[in-house]
Structure formats: structure tokens, C-alpha cells
């Protein structure tokens, strides 16, 4: 478990009790445009995902942590995915519940995952693919000294996810 005393934010393994929160986050159509989703996940599929989340990152090439407060209430999720141990790199995915944004939770979580990646996995590169329209996420990663190394043009069709 990755832990910090600062504001009692913890990154912890997924638990079956996280299913409702995970279901709501993964099926929030307002977030799909940032995750390349276009269809909902079933509760059954997400329960299977939680059950299989104990696989080692070297086997599954990904790991998802629940971000929780001091009472173990989930606030969001942070992932390492596209894990490449030979090249010592991974991508980061981060989502904080809408009602908990702008409270520093994303920043604290990013600090913790960076420490975990460096000290436990010995990674030397973390990256994130962020839509330029996602200003708060771009700002967060810049604050943490991530460098914009490229810009894809017409890569993500965000309007495809707009509700009519």
C-alpha cells in the first residue's frame, strides 16, 4: 500500500466494496471522451475486474489504485497502464470524483503514484495522454513537472461524446 500522512490520502488496492463507485465513474458519459470509451461497462464485468486486480503488474501490465480518505471512502482512481518494464515506463490515468475536485486530491495522488513508480517499480518515465481541452488535467501534470512532448492534431473527436 502506498500511503501519505498529508491530508490522509491513501492509494490502496481495489475492494469489492468499491463496485458502486467504480461503476459510476466508469459509466459517466462525461468522462468517456477522455478515456476513449463509447459503451458502458456492466457491473458483472467490473466485479470480475476487481477480482482479477490482484494480478501482479508485471503480468497484467497495469495496476489501478483506489484513492481513499482516512475513513477508506473512495475519492477516485489512479492507474499505471501500458507498463513496459524493459523500458522502465508506464502511462498514468487519473480520475477524481466530480464532487471532490479542486481539493488537491489529484495532486497528492500524482505525488504518491510517482513515488510508487520510482521506488517500487524502478521506473524512470511516466507519461499521460491528455486531451488539450482537459485544462485542469493539463495544469495538474504541468504542476508536477511533466513536459508536453507532442501534440496530436485531430486525434480525439471529443464532440462524438456530446449528449444530444
Question: What name fits each language-model region?
Answer:
Residues 103-116, 139-143:
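Conserved acetyl-CoA-binding loop-helix of GNAT-fold acetyltransferases
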